[in-house]
């Protein structure tokens, strides 16, 4: 497996504990998310690159930070951050990364993506991997009735697991 340089932001997380921020104080966690967003797309992409195919816990910091970014961007007043993050997450979901990674990213999109993001994710409704297919279908359903026509068309054109999932 190719060695990926880990994001400097993961080093700011303490040892894992059973709490919302994995042991970091809420204010420190909020500053950490703000610093990542301030650094921009490269910082978020670096976290995504750090995700492992097998969720063995080795990449818990990247997963926690990507999740906290999604939660942060779910606040209505953060539309600018949400737009940037949605684009980065959608790009990662559409990439050739392992299905487990793409599925995780799609799960995070459920926290803040809306129906305007659905057309860009349409190719994933034909994905051959059930993990990705289930995650994108759940995402589209969570976007509400605005995605109904997209899902109906995708279901008509689908076969196998896709037909059941959609």
Question: How does the language model describe each region?
Answer:
Residues 13-24, 36, 51-55, 92-97, ...:
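Alpha-solenoid helical repeat architecture
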Residues 12-13, 46-51, 85-90, 120-122, ...:
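Buried hydrophobic core positions in alpha-solenoid tandem helical repeats
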Residues 83-88, 129, 158-160:
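Alpha-helical scaffold repeats of the Armadillo/HEAT/TPR superfamily
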Residues 7, 83, 156-157, 164:
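Positively charged, low-complexity intrinsically disordered regions
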Residues 1-31:
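N-terminal "cap/leader" segments of large eukaryotic alpha-helical scaffolds
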Residues 1-2, 27-39, 49, 59-79, ...:
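Structural detector for internal amphipathic alpha-helices that build alpha-solenoid repeat scaffolds
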């Amino acid at each position: 497996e190719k060695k990926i340089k880990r994001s400097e932001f993961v080093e700011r997380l303490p040892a894992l504990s059973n709490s919302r921020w994995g042991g970091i104080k809420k204010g420190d966690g909020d500053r950490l998310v703000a610093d990542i967003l301030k650094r921009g797309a490269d910082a978020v992409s670096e976290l995504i690159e750090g995700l492992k195919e097998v969720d063995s816990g080795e990449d818990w910091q990247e997963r926690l930070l990507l999740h906290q970014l999604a939660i942060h961007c779910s606040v209505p007043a953060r539309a600018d951050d949400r737009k940037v993050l949605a684009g980065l997450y959608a790009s990662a979901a559409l990439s050739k990364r392992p299905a487990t990674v793409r599925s995780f990213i799609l799960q995070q999109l459920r926290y803040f993506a809306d129906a305007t993001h659905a057309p860009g994710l349409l190719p994933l409704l034909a994905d051959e991997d059930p993990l990705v297919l289930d995650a994108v279908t759940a995402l589209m359903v969570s976007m509400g009735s605005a995605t109904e026509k997209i899902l109906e068309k995708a279901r008509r054109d689908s076969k196998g697991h896709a037909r059941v999932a959609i």
